[in-house]
Structure formats: structure tokens, C-alpha cells
């Protein structure tokens, strides 16, 4: 379409956001191949996935394998973890960010062939977590639901993408427009078309250099209005953009 876009994290010099990194980078958030498990009331342990390493999931909850949790303040029992996404019909959504099935993969500018291969690895990582739940935590009666997705592997059609290209829109909506909307030079709150009410919540736990990134777990923000100009590209007519591709800063995208 010819729409210009940004990828990754802008520096605080670019966006004037005090919690942004000092330098811009192309790092995006982890994605997740969510799994829906069903209780079959019998042992339904899957075949061990290729390259399975239980230590990758060791501190997803409190268990004997977890000796040095990276997030000691966010540790729960296996039962609390598994019921986090409890659904009707004895099903469980597995979308667990703490050493679970989050997976770092920047496929935004990959070819179709490269994406297909990379996404198979992401699927395999989720299967590894399912196998860990079954063999290390004792949930061997839970396995991929056979009546949720019409796919051969019983996984969703696509992963949960937390980040994509963000267009250069008529306006760029930053954290400052949320935290102090009436103090900005551009009164974007006057053009709001939708209301948001969720904290800044970034997933970077599977990125190998996560220690160098800002900690953006549930950074509090007030309710906010989303301006119309974030949906409209700056230089292309007759196009409206939605979801993760609107014109916001990386911080706000989270």
C-alpha cells in the first residue's frame, strides 16, 4: 500500500515518554500460540515434542524444578496457574507469560516461507509447555481439545500477535496523551472515537536481552480516549487501519 510504518521500540527522545528506552530498537513483544486444553479424564500425554527442554518452563509455577525464578513475586501454584484461563466445559486456555508459552519471534518482515518455518517452531514451543504440564506438573488428563479448532494440530489458525507494523498516521498517540491529555500541545482527546482502559503491559520475557529493556509490566494509566487520526495513514488515501497497526508509540501499543 505504500504506507510508512515503525517497528520496535522508540527512544524516549523520539516520543518524550519517560519509561521508553534510551535508544530505539527493533525489538517487538513475544507472541503466543495459545492452546485450549480439555480434560479427557484419562492419561492423554502427548508425544515428547522435538527439542523439548523442561528447564525452559521450570519456573512457570511453584514446583521442584524451579530453583531460581526470574520473577519471584509472580509465582503461583500449578493449580492457580492452570485455572487462570479456565473455560466452561472442562477446558483451559493456556496463555501463560511466566516461563510458559510466550515465544520471541519477529516475523514482521520475513518472507512467507520463513514465516511458515518460524511459526512451526512457535507451535512446537507451546506443545513443549503442554508436555511439561502433563509430565512435570501432573496434568496428564489435560490435552489439546479436539473440538475447538478445525486444524490438524488442534492449535489456533494464527498465534496471538502482540505487535506488528505501526503506521505513521495523521497523529501519533503516546503515553503522554494518556497520562496528561490536557497538557499536550495537540489536544487529541477532542477527537476521541473509542475508550481504552488497560495498563501498559509488555511481554518480553522470552527475548534473550530482556534485562536491557524497560520493565513494562502493568504500568498504571488512567482510562483514555483513542483519537481518530491514529487509524488514518498520513500519506495514503482511502485506507483505515485497525488493531495493532494503528499509529501509536510502542509503549502505548502494549
What are these regions (language model features)?
Residues 2-253:
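Flavin (FAD/FMN)-binding glycine-rich loop and adjacent Rossmann-like elements that form
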Amino acid at each position: 500500500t505504500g504506507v510508512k510504518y515503525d517497528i520496535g521500540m522508540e527512544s524516549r527522545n523520539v516520543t518524550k515518554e519517560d519509561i521508553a528506552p534510551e535508544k530505539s530498537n527493533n525489538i517487538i513483544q513475544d507472541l503466543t500460540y495459545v492452546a485450549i486444553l480439555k480434560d479427557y479424564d484419562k492419561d492423554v500425554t502427548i508425544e515428547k515434542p522435538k527439542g523439548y527442554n523442561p528447564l525452559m518452563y521450570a519456573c512457570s509455577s511453584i514446583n521442584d524444578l524451579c530453583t531460581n525464578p526470574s520473577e519471584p513475586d509472580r509465582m503461583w501454584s500449578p493449580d492457580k496457574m492452570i485455572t487462570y484461563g479456565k473455560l466452561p466445559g472442562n477446558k483451559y486456555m493456556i496463555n501463560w507469560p511466566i516461563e510458559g508459552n510466550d515465544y520471541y519471534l519477529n516475523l514482521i518482515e520475513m518472507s512467507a516461507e520463513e514465516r511458515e518455518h518460524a511459526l512451526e517452531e512457535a507451535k512446537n514451543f507451546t506443545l513443549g509447555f503442554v508436555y511439561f504440564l502433563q509430565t512435570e506438573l501432573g496434568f496428564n488428563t489435560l490435552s489439546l481439545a479436539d473440538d475447538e479448532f478445525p486444524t490438524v494440530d488442534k492449535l489456533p489458525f494464527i498465534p496471538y500477535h502482540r505487535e506488528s507494523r505501526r503506521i505513521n498516521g495523521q497523529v501519533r498517540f503516546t503515553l503522554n496523551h494518556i497520562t496528561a491529555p490536557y497538557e499536550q500541545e495537540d489536544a487529541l482527546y477532542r477527537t476521541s472515537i473509542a475508550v481504552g482502559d488497560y495498563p501498559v503491559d509488555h511481554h518480553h520475557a522470552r527475548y534473550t536481552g530482556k534485562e536491557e529493556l524497560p520493565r513494562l509490566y502493568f504500568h498504571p494509566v488512567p482510562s483514555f480516549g483513542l483519537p481518530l487520526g491514529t487509524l488514518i495513514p498520513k500519506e495514503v488515501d482511502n485506507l483505515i487501519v485497525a488493531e495493532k497497526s494503528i499509529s501509536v508509540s510502542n509503549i502505548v501499543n502494549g
